[in-house]
Regions:
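Conserved beta-hairpin
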Residues: 53-67
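A short beta-loop-alpha structural element at the N-terminal edge
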Residues: 2-16
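Conserved GNAT-fold acetyl-CoA-binding loop/helix
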Residues: 19-45
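Conserved acetyl-CoA pyrophosphate-binding loop and the N-cap/start of the following alpha-helix
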Residues: 85, 89-97, 126
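C-terminal "cap" of GNAT-fold acetyltransferases
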Residues: 107, 111-119, 134-155
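Conserved acyl-CoA
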Residues: 93-109, 119
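A short, internal acetyl-CoA/4′-phosphopantetheine-binding micro-motif in the GNAT/acyltransferase core
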Residues: 76-86
C-alpha cells in the first residue's frame, strides 16, 4: 500500500470513497437519520477544507484509492476504507501511518469512534474515555465514543 498527502484534485474521489463506505456499512449499525448525519458531516466542502489544511492522507493499492484518513494535531478523524478492502489489514496500516504523524509531538492521540470501528480501535490500544451525543433529525440521538491511545507506552 502506498500513501501520500491528498491534493485538491483528490477531493471528489475521496468524497466518493467516504460516501460509498458510509452508505454501505453504516446502515447495519445506525438508523437512517444517523447515516444521513454522517453523510452530510463528510461533505465535499469539509473534505476540501481539510485537504487545504494539509491534514488528509490518501491510501492506494495498485493505483486504486482504497482509503483515507485525516490527522489534525493529535486528533485522527475521517478514517475510511472502501468496503471491498476492509478486513485485509489496510485499516491497520493506515492507522499506523496516522499515529506516526502524531508520535513525538503529543503523548496521546484521540478520535471519535463510530460503532463499526470501536472494536478495531480497541485492538489498536484505544480506550473509551467518554461518550458524546448529537441530536439528529426526527429526535434521533447519535451516541459515539471518544477514544484515546497513550503513545508514550508505545516505546
Amino acid at each position: 500500500m502506498k500513501y501520500r498527502e491528498a491534493k485538491a484534485e483528490d477531493c471528489s474521489q475521496i468524497y466518493a470513497l467516504v460516501q460509498e463506505t458510509i452508505k454501505t456499512v453504516y446502515p447495519k449499525y445506525y438508523p437512517a437519520e444517523v447515516v444521513e448525519f454522517f453523510s452530510a458531516l463528510h461533505s465535499p466542502d469539509n473534505i476540501a477544507q481539510d485537504i487545504g489544511n494539509r491534514t488528509v492522507a490518501a491510501f492506494y493499492e495498485k493505483d486504486v484509492l482504497i482509503g483515507t484518513g485525516t490527522c489534525r494535531e493529535n486528533h485522527i478523524t475521517r478514517v475510511f476504507v472502501l468496503p471491498a478492502y476492509q478486513g485485509q489489514g489496510y485499516g491497520s496500516q493506515m492507522m499506523q501511518y496516522l499515529e506516526e504523524r502524531v508520535l513525538g509531538r503529543y503523548e496521546k492521540v484521540c478520535l471519535d469512534a463510530s460503532l463499526p470501528a470501536c472494536q478495531f480501535y480497541e485492538k489498536r490500544g484505544y480506550v473509551t474515555v467518554r461518550h458524546e451525543t448529537w441530536k439528529c433529525e426526527n429526535d434521533v440521538v447519535l451516541v459515539y465514543g471518544i477514544m484515546e491511545k497513550d503513545l508514550t507506552a508505545k516505546a
